[in-house]
């Protein structure tokens, strides 16, 4: 299976409501490799915009081909707009480089950012206010973009960018181990009580098989704990106080910690070896030695299957476990593009038009052209990104199912 790393990638996370989606990466490209900004408005109303995060031919030949196709299609439909691509892989600069770029003001007209980057971008004064340019005419799917994704590019009522991808976490489970343990592989647990029951049954299979896995090294333990807190309607930080205060020492949080303690020390459903860092659980899961753990869908298509050689047919996803069976939220993350404050009005309009074509229209561009993804050998059908609600999300799901190359029914519990 080909990796979709360039298409869907992320690093920082933010807490969102359960209705919010998932964030992933899309990019832009054309002929130029200059990192400087494009021209404002030339003769005859022509405009050039520079866009970073374009996939280089050397590292990502298929993604590069798709990008070039999209640029050609877009420029043919908009002959007054030229896309000047800046090729970089990976497109997310290390924090020090990103900070240096902002301080120097050397960003492209449209530049790649994570959902968590806006405060730093605004502090550096390197974002154009695009509020007056974005509406349901310039971005027809605008009203269906999940609120949390759009909020990542807002400060008060002002909009400084557009999201292009997102993600959220869920329960990844081994359907084969569920069957072997006498459990229903189409009915993953939704409460911590059910997790305990199912994990214990799986652990009883023996042969080094663990029912539940979790991280506790490399900051990953706190990352998962934050997601568990969100799922029960809590938060790690109370932002209503001045200054904000820690808010994770609650009865609900204590119940979650007690559940993990019971899984580890009473049920013996977790590995006796802890201090696990990211990457360990994926390897264990791919080897058929782990029943369940939480992650985003990209763990499957970027790590478990292509890297650790897991069997795609054995994998299912469900929602994050909660105390009630209905998660109130989840850690989510994503990315999109901000606009340079040096952009002219014509460049802002052209940039919005490009993002609408490339990343915000079902069936179009780099993110949602599932027909082309299938033809180019990429896996199609994973429930990511989930950038929309309403009619737009229904259209995305219809196209995703139409061109699916994976068993999409195994992710129904997660999507619903």
Enumerate the language-model features and the residues they cover.
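C-terminal lobe and pocket-closing loops
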Residues: 298-311, 325-416
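Short, solvent-exposed loop/beta-turn-alpha elements that line the ligand-binding surface or hinge
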Residues: 128-145, 188-190, 211-216, 234-255, ...
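Conserved N-terminal structural module of periplasmic/extracytoplasmic solute-binding proteins
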Residues: 2-120, 136-139, 185, 274, ...
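Glycine-centered hinge/linker elements that transmit conformational signals in sensory
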Residues: 196-200, 242-274
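Extracytoplasmic/periplasmic solute-binding protein
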Residues: 35, 155-164, 169, 179, ...
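Short helix-initiation/N-cap motifs at beta->coil->alpha
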Residues: 87-97, 190-196, 273-286
């Amino acid at each position: 299976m080909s990796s979709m790393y360039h298409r869907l990638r992320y690093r920082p996370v933010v807490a969102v409501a359960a209705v919010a989606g998932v964030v992933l990466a899309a990019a832009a490209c054309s002929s130029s490799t200059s990192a400087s900004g494009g021209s404002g408005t030339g003769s005859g109303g022509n405009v050039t915009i520079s866009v970073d995060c374009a996939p280089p031919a050397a590292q990502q030949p298929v993604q590069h081909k798709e990008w070039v196709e999209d640029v050609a299609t877009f420029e043919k439909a908009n002959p007054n707009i030229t896309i000047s691509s800046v090729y970089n892989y990976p497109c997310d600069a290390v924090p020090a480089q990103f900070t240096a770029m902002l301080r120097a003001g050397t960003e492209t007209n449209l530049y790649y950012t994570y959902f968590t980057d806006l405060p730093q971008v605004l502090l550096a004064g390197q974002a154009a206010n695009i509020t007056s340019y974005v509406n349901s005419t310039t971005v027809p799917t605008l009203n269906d973009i999940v609120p949390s994704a759009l909020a990542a590019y807002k400060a008060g009522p002002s909009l400084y960018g557009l999201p292009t991808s997102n993600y959220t976490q869920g329960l990844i489970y081994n359907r084969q181990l569920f069957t072997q343990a006498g459990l229903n592989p189409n009915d993953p647990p939704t409460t911590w009580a059910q997790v305990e029951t199912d994990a214990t049954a799986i652990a009883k299979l023996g042969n080094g098989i663990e029912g539940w896995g979790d991280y506790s090294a490399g900051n990953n333990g706190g990352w998962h704990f934050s997601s568990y807190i969100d799922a029960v309607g809590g938060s790690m930080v109370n932002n209503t106080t001045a200054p904000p205060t820690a808010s994770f020492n609650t009865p609900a949080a204590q119940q979650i910690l007690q559940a993990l303690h019971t899984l580890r020390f009473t049920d013996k459903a977790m590995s006796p070896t802890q201090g696990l860092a990211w990457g360990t659980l994926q390897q264990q899961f791919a080897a058929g030695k782990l029943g369940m753990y939480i992650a985003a869908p990209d763990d499957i298509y970027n790590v478990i299957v292509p890297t650790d050689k897991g069997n795609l047919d054995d994998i299912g996803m469900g929602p994050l476990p909660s105390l009630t069976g209905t998660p109130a939220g989840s850690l989510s993350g994503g990315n999109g593009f901000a606009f340079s404050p040096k952009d002219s009005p014509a460049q802002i309009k052209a940039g919005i038009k490009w993002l609408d074509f490339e990343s915000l229209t079902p069936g179009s561009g780099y993110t949602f052209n599932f027909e082309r993804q299938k033809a180019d050998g990429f896996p199609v059908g994973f429930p990511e990104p989930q950038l929309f609600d309403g009619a737009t999300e229904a259209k995305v799901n219809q196209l995703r199912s139409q061109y699916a190359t994976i068993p999409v029914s195994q992710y129904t519990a997660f999507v619903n």
